[in-house]
Structure formats: structure tokens, C-alpha cells
Amino acid sequence: MAKYQGEVQSLKLDDDSVIEGVSDQVLVAVVVSLALIATLVYALFSRNAHQNIHPENQELVRVLREQLQTEQDAPAAARQQFYTDMYCPICLHQASLPVETNCGHLFCGTCIVAYWRYGSWLGAISCPICRQTVTLLLPVFGENDQSQDVVSLHQDISDYNRRFSGQPRSIMERIMDLPTLLRHAFREMFSVGGLFWMFRIRIILCLMGAFFYLISPLDFVPEALFGILGFLDDFFVIFLLLIYISIMYREVITQRLNR
């Protein structure tokens, strides 16, 4: 009888959780999951709040700014609404025909091309803001305009991407490029005339694979044995799938240039 009462008391202690019927480990897992998802969403749909030129590039940008004659009368072209800061840090004007680098910084298309040609045009440039190597220039303006300036800018961007988009990338550089590439990949995925269907199917299969792995009881690190630590392999698998999607998107851009 005493043994039975002890077991009942032990069960009561085990059930003493913050929310009745839900273990504390599950609550911690949910909170951590939501925090990671919120961080990823913030990284995907936000950019650096401070668009300050890196000290090592200030002199080059100053000279280039004088050459570009920053007094521009032409209005800025149409832009995507999810950008909150539409000012080019090179010319200090509202970004015209904006282009985003793989590191997530926005510039006028003509400004970043001039920055490339004024500097070492034989090699990939370093971002004027964060000094990360720029291997992709992603246009954020519409392609309906077929004016001479827009066509010329598209040719310059394609020329740059054709030269440097296939450069080897370290795992850390791929992680740093992840928010920007995923944002553009998912935007094209849900737009008419964006990504071709085979690539969309591959993205859907990756997302479905991540979902089924999350709900599957078969894990590399079982939650039943390791508790909250058992969720680490789930996040790791999802993280690898996101990196794989960004690599696929980079390959799609390279294939477009070689057509």
C-alpha cells in the first residue's frame, strides 16, 4: 500500500507542469521552435536597418559619388513594397532601378555597376556596407520597362552574375546568403512567370520532406530518450534543406544566364 501511494505521489509530481496535461519539455520545445521560426521570418523579410558605408570603402564611394553627379532628376522606378529603406547608400538618393546583393543590401543598379567598374572590374566586388563578397546581383525592379537604360542595366547585371555567380562558396558564406536567396526564391515561386515548374516541385518536395520528418516518430535523436535535445536534429535537417533550396536557386540563376 505504501509503495502504491509512493508511485501515485511520484506521478503527481511528474504532472506538476505549467499547463495541466502538457509536459514542460513540450512547452520548451514549442517556445524554442516559435523563436527560431520568428527569427527566420525576420531575417527573410527584413534588411539591415543601418545602411552605412564600411570605413574601408568610404573614400572610393566618395570619389564615385562625385563622378555619378548625384543630382538626379529622373524619378525612381517602381519597387517592391517589402523594402523599408529605399535609399542608395552610394548616391544618397532614393534608389532608382534598385538591385539587391546576395548579402541583402540595396543599391541603385547604376551605382553598384559603376562601383564595380570603377574598382577592380576583373574580380567580384566587396559589398560597400558589410565587405562580404558580392557574387550575385538580384534586380528588384520590374522587367516590363524596355528603355535603353533598363536594357543596358540588365546586360551589366547578367555580365556580372555570369562571371561571379559560380564562384566557390564556404558554408559560412552560404549561411549568410540564406535569408536573401530564400526571400527571392519564395517570391518567384508564387509569382506568374517566375521559377520553372521543375524547380517549384523540388522546393515543394523539400518542404514536404521536412514536414514528414518532423511528424515522424523515427529520429536520429529520439525525443523520448533525450527530451528537448531530441528536437535538435529536426532543426538541423530543416536548416540543411533551406541551404539546399538556396543552392538550387543560385543554380537556377546561373542556368538562366547560360541560355
Curated annotation (Swiss-Prot):
Pfam family, one: zf-RING_UBOX
EC class of the enzyme, as a word: transferase
TM annotation in the entry: 26-46, 203-223, 225-245
Spans within the Lumenal topological domain: 1-25, 224
Subcellular location: Endoplasmic reticulum membrane
A GO CC term attached to the entry: endoplasmic reticulum membrane
Biological process (GO), any one: protein ubiquitination
Keyword Transmembrane helix attached: yes
Pathway: Protein modification; protein ubiquitination
Top-rank taxon: Eukaryota
SUPFAM superfamilies: RING/U-box
Molecular function per GO: ubiquitin protein ligase activity; zinc ion binding
InterPro entries: DUF1232 (IPR010652), RNF170 (IPR038896), Znf-RING_euk (IPR027370), Znf_RING (IPR001841), Znf_RING/FYVE/PHD (IPR013083), Znf_RING_CS (IPR017907)
Function: E3 ubiquitin-protein ligase. Plays an essential role in stimulus-induced inositol 1,4,5-trisphosphate receptor type 1 (ITPR1) ubiquitination and degradation via the endoplasmic reticulum-associated degradation (ERAD) pathway. Also involved in ITPR1 turnover in resting cells. Selectively inhibits the TLR3-triggered innate immune response by promoting the 'Lys-48'-linked polyubiquitination and degradation of TLR3.
Protein name: E3 ubiquitin-protein ligase RNF170
Gene: RNF170
